[in-house]
């Protein structure tokens, strides 16, 4: 029985109790929202992750970290270093490897990860076809489905499944005047398969079987946005919205069948459209968890897209987005190295918290209030240990040596908080 089915029967499981304690939400609210598909627990019952990661309505915003090899850079040691960084900063992890022994890499990443691991199975199908048959679109439907099942057996907790993309939508998008017709790698692979084979999306024609597979492992289907905007000029055009409408139908079918599901979102979105992007998705899908890539609010930010996108991510989180997929300084330019992965992860941890202050209020802001209290008292050790990155904060605090006065080296003896405390003493 899946977690959704248990919740519908009114069962408060140990996992629901753990979610309640972690997120400070009543067990009954958690149960009800799981039953409705508004909260999910990323997991694979055959291989549980070490970290409990509930995502959805009324819960803190989570962040996802993408790692993985490319056809140009295959360095397993570097990817495993990224796993360590992900364990420290992230909530979920996706292995997007496209180079090397994909099965071996995935299994090693899952073994080293404390987090639920996700994948995009069409990558492996396309790459295997390319290597064996000299063309990426030559894989059969059975080969794609067998890869999905193999990855579930390995312990994958969630997968991007581009089932909302129809053949007709793909053809129209490719013929359109979009700045960039398709930027989703997995989406483009599915589009290419449909055009080459003259068939409908294999995820759509095998949807019922996919539901059975995911239900067996109680894993999550992450409905990919193949036609997400890859330029702010393309945001919320007929193709993005058309796919979202198709996706919304699949969402309802998955939940009705007791399968956990979330929806992936853009992408590149102008600042003024970010909040209503979230609200539109929630309205169409009945409030299932929303997993957004950024979004980037400008197109010219590289190599600072982790900053440009964290602006959109904070707004999305505040508006109700549930899972933020990070970007790194290497986005649009290169495979990220380990340092860039950490920089992206920290930017998104900040964005998620900024959004949660709006979305969840005082219970989240308590952390900020504690830091501000210690800052006002110039209790540096206590303040620093509460910060988002205490180790780096201490390095910055002491970069010119230990301050000679109680204040930091910015204001020194002219620190307003130090003087305010003196004035308070005089006032009595």
UniProtKB/Swiss-Prot annotation:
Q: In which pathway does it act?
A: Cofactor biosynthesis; thiamine diphosphate biosynthesis
Q: Which PANTHER family does the UniProt record give?
A: PHOSPHOMETHYLPYRIMIDINE SYNTHASE, CHLOROPLASTIC (PTHR30557:SF1), THIAMINE BIOSYNTHESIS PROTEIN THIC (PTHR30557)
Return the cofactor note field.
Binds 1 [4Fe-4S] cluster per subunit. The cluster is coordinated with 3 cysteines and an exchangeable S-adenosyl-L-methionine.
Q: Which cofactor does it need?
A: [4Fe-4S] cluster
Q: What is this protein called?
A: Phosphomethylpyrimidine synthase
Q: Which positions does UniProt annotate for [4Fe-4S] cluster binding?
A: 408, 411, 415
Enumerate the UniProt keywords alphabetically.
4Fe-4S, Iron, Iron-sulfur, Lyase, Metal-binding, S-adenosyl-L-methionine, Thiamine biosynthesis, Zinc
Q: Does the keyword NAD apply?
A: no
Q: Report any one BP term from Gene Ontology.
A: thiamine biosynthetic process
The job of this chain, per UniProt, is described as:
Catalyzes the synthesis of the hydroxymethylpyrimidine phosphate (HMP-P) moiety of thiamine from aminoimidazole ribotide (AIR) in a radical S-adenosyl-L-methionine (SAM)-dependent reaction.
| Enzyme Commission number | 4.1.99.17
> Where along the chain is substrate bound?
66, 94, 123, 162, 184-186, 225-228, 264, 291
Q: Where does Zn(2+) bind?
A: 268, 332
Give the InterPro entries listed for this entry: ThiC, ThiC/Bza_core_dom, ThiC/BzaA/B
> What terms describe the molecular function in GO for this protein?
4 iron, 4 sulfur cluster binding; carbon-carbon lyase activity; zinc ion binding
Give the family per the record.
Belongs to the ThiC family.
Provenance organism: Sulfolobus acidocaldarius (strain ATCC 33909 / DSM 639 / JCM 8929 / NBRC 15157 / NCIMB 11770)
Gene encoding this polypeptide?
thiC
Which reaction(s) are listed as its catalytic activity?
A: 5-amino-1-(5-phospho-beta-D-ribosyl)imidazole + S-adenosyl-L-methionine = 4-amino-2-methyl-5-(phosphooxymethyl)pyrimidine + CO + 5'-deoxyadenosine + formate + L-methionine + 3 H(+)
Pfam families given for it? ThiC_Rad_SAM (PF01964)
């Amino acid at each position: 029985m899946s977690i959704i089915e248990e919740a519908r029967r009114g069962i408060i499981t140990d996992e629901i109790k753990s979610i309640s304690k972690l997120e400070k939400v009543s067990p009954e609210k958690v149960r009800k929202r799981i039953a409705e598909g508004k909260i999910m627990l990323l997991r694979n019952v055959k291989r549980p992750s070490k970290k409990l990661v509930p995502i959805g309505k009324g819960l803190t915003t989570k962040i996802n970290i993408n790692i993985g090899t490319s056809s140009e850079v295959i360095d397993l040691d570097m990817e495993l270093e990224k796993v360590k960084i992900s364990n420290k900063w992230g909530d979920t992890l996706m292995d997007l490897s496209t180079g090397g022994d994909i099965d071996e890499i995935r299994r090693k990443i899952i073994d080293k990860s404390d987090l639920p691991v996700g994948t995009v199975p069409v990558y492996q199908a396309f790459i295997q076809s390319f290597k064996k048959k000299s063309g990426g679109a030559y894989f059969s439907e059975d080969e794609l489905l067998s890869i999905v099942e193999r990855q579930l057996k390995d312990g994958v907790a969630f997968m991007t499944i581009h089932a909302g993309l129809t053949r007709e939508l793909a053809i129209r998008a490719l013929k359109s005047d979009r700045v960039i017709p398709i930027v989703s790698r997995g989406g483009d692979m599915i589009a290419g398969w449909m055009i080459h084979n003259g068939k409908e999306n294999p995820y759509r024609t095998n949807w019922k079987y996919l539901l059975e597979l995911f239900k067996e492992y109680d894993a999550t289907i992450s409905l990919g946005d193949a036609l997400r905007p890859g330029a702010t000029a393309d945001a919320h055009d007929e193709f993005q919205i058309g796919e979202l409408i198709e996706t919304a139908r699949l969402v309802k079918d998955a939940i009705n069948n007791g399968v956990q599901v979330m929806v992936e979102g853009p992408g590149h979105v102008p600042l003024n459209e970010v909040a209503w992007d979230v609200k539109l998705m929630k309205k169409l899908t009945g409030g299932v968890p929303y997993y957004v890539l950024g979004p980037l609010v400008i197109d010219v930010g590289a190599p600072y897209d982790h900053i440009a996108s964290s602006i959109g991510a904070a707004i999305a989180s505040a508006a109700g987005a549930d899972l933020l997929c990070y970007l790194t300084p290497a986005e649009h330019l290169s495979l990220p190295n380990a340092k860039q992965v950490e920089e992206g992860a920290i930017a998104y941890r900040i964005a998620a918290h900024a959004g949660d202050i709006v979305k969840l209020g005082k219970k989240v802001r308590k952390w900020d209030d504690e830091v501000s209290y210690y800052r006002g008292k110039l209790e540096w050790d206590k303040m620093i240990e509460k910060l988002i990155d205490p180790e780096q904060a201490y390095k910055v605090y002491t970069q010119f040596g230990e301050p000679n006065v109680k204040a930091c080296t910015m204001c020194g003896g002219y620190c307003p908080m130090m003087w305010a405390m003196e004035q308070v003493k005089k006032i009595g």
